[in-house]
Amino acid sequence: AKDDFNEEIDYMGATLSVSGTGVFASSLSRYFDRVLELMAGSVLEPLLTQEEFERQRDLLKENLKTADKDVATAADRVENLLTYGAKHPNGEFISQESIDKITLNDVKDYFENYSKSTNAFLVIIGDVEFEDIKTKVTSLFNGWEAGEVIASSYPTPTNPEKSEIIFVDMPNATQSVVSIINTIDFNKKESDFFAALVANRILGGGGSGRLFNNLREDKGWTYGSYSGINESYKTKGVVIAQAQVRNEVTDSSAVELLKEIDKMRNTLVTDEEMQNAKAKYTGNFVLSLENASTVASFARNIITQDLTEDYYNTFLSNIDKVSKEDVQKASQKYFQTNTTRIFITGKGSEILESLENIDYNGEKLTVRYFDNFGNETARPDYSVDESVSAASIINNYIDAIGGADKLESVSSIE
């Protein structure tokens, strides 16, 4: 039973989690054999019951009710949809309707089609001997069915021919989410991979990045502004520069993000920025090695992404080799301002007019309008009906509760 399973895991102080693409387990060495046995059971014979399916489905739907009203969640949803496309897995999002369409049989079919030993890698890190663990794994996973897994195909994401503003109206927003995103061909095997990492660190990879120093330290428009460069071995990666800002500085923030990106493209970074970025990568990399799951992910990446055996052994030396010229070339290749999407999610009645007047590099940017589920719409109309006044609102309310006579009959309020 599921409760017995969870209780035993808790008793051992272990962790065992299952997702749609894999299983992760962690435990003390003395409980390793039993945890490995439970892990094998969850892979080979998962407990897929109607009762648990309905419980998880209802929980997911309840969480969505809150998320649907969240500005940051809406921003992420539309950003992913328009960046990757509706038919790309990274562009899909969960909705009440999509959850209702799923049945337990769909879940079982997914498991049968994709959970194959020929499509799996098992990485074990810890105080173990190879021959001993090989014997145990062979015994426990011996019954795992092999078979071909059919890979899905989907359209290749593209950037717009000219930069455009994607506006998402959220009337309840007290802040705006501004994100500049473009897709890139980028993975760990790229010759300029390490230069791009350093470039991103300098642009907005932390509290010492240019975006943070500009929008937070200098102007005080946000609690933080950051950038990211995300690789993908199988599909397109993305570059993103982002900030959550006050409504009244939304347009100015978008322009400042674009300026900082162009500055990375057009000028060399400083010696101090190079030194700080490399030092930060060195510190983070060394600290990450203390986490066994990080070491396991390194081993998995070497196998699944066709990396050289010494890829992570030479990681820091490759970071150290990056020059200022390398950073500028990588910035020119991956950071874009002319063919990018500028996503702005916020309160249109306060920010839209200024967004429609943004002029960058001598050209006014086109604005497209979307709802919070990524459906393109007409421009929102914020004009107020002339017949509506404070007096009419009060009178309509009085009529709704029964009229003036009923209101005058109220003698006390508790």
Feature-to-residue mapping (PLM):
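Short acidic/His-enriched helical or mixed secondary-structure segments at domain edges of catalytic enzymes
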Residues: 59-78, 156-175, 213-224, 267-318
